[in-house]
Amino acid sequence: MEGPGVHDPLLELFDQSNGVTTDSRQCGPGLLYIALKGERFDGNAFALEAIRKGCIAAVVDNPDVKGENLIHVPDGLDALQQLARSHRQRFQAPVFGLTGSNGKTTTKELIRAVIGQELKVHATQGNLNNHIGVPLTLLSIPVDTEFALIEMGANHQGEIAALCTIAEPTFGMITNVGLAHLEGFGGVEGVKKGKQELYRHLASKGGTAFVHAADPDLIALSNLEGLERLPYGTPNHPPHAWRSAGSVDAPIYWSVSAGAAPGPWHDGQGALEVHLHGAHQLANMQAAIAVGVHFGVSPGAINAALGAFLPVDQRGETVTTERNTVIVDCYNANPSSVESTLRAFASAGHEAPLAILGDMMELGSHAAHGHRMVRDVARECAVECWVVGHDFAAHAPGDRTFPDVNALRSALAEEGIEGRTILLKGSRSMRM
């Protein structure tokens, strides 16, 4: 880690610590505790407890909290974010910002796996991708990091711009722009403007964006003065990856030869076998290949990383039980992601397929249209579809409709299902 020195008392204290926490339950010897306030809690109330647990200091923004080893600041969240920004400004390794409506976390993990073949990577853990998670991610970057991968989430315009101000990415990628968080963004155009904030930040700093060349929205949004674009994902914009015969279970091939006859680049190892399915996952893999090629990862190492990759928790993982095979994709859901998942599920040739879909949240006035659209896709794909939740029940009943997960669970327990491949897809809050 290199870069200009930053003279900041809080930064100096951070350097003496074993890390930062905002959760009093995780406090321990040598940590620096920063008190934050939320709707249902006030971290200032736990500052003295943090000191008793061994924290070297506690940062508080309530002047009524008094004691030893307390640092009073006007605003705890602002202190956390400014500390993270100061820490980030001290190192010169590539900082890669990643956002998008769908596929952020899977793409992040694919890129982590690929780049990790050659470089020391530090990436966002779990869903720490918001105004608190991004600073914590930056503050946890080890000194020997050679590539920082920062996932950025948002549900309102202006949030990505704020995260970019903290993380200052030098490279970036938007996976796609879809029908997610429509309520907060104010519609599809709001989503586009919100996600474009990453491109705009990169353009203002002379940064570089990896752009999926098959996505016209991303091509248009990235057409900014000062932004270096690295298009990928089509035969004319390599690296390009594809499946033979268009089957979701067919081997994957990829090439970096623009304008040449299609031919797999597999480093003499044969076709690449992966554990991901669906056209949307192919795009995620194209993204990881493009980043890997740019940063000098060998084709053999890229294949090794992708071939060993397994879906992360509740993002397309397959669970085989004594009775059925269950594809669990319940981390989040919006009309765009559910449509792509349904189409992939329908085309996979599963025996006795059954889709169980839960309500999609944060759609606002678009809720009725979004749920009807998804139900129409299921009909078009000829997939038996059970639906769970108020919005589906009100706007788009399925072959069977359940008011909540408890009703679904009771029906499954009473009737039993055997010999089926079941897709579970819904928003996290549905607790599918």
What residues fall within each predicted segment?
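Acidic, Mg2+-coordinating active-site environments of NTP-dependent enzymes
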Residues: 2, 60-67, 173-325, 350-351, ...
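N-terminal leader/targeting and accessory segments in enzymes
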Residues: 1-82, 86, 346-352, 363, ...
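Generic hydrophobic/aromatic pocket-lining and core-packing "Φ" positions
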Residues: 47, 160, 195, 199, ...
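Phosphate-binding loop of NTP-binding sites
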Residues: 2-4, 79-213, 217-227, 410-411, ...
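Short glycine/threonine-rich catalytic loop with a Thr-x-Gly-x-Asp
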Residues: 20-24, 39, 276-287, 310-316, ...
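A glycine-rich beta-strand to alpha-helix segment
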Residues: 99, 412-432
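AMP-binding/adenylate-forming catalytic core of the ANL superfamily
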Residues: 191, 333-394
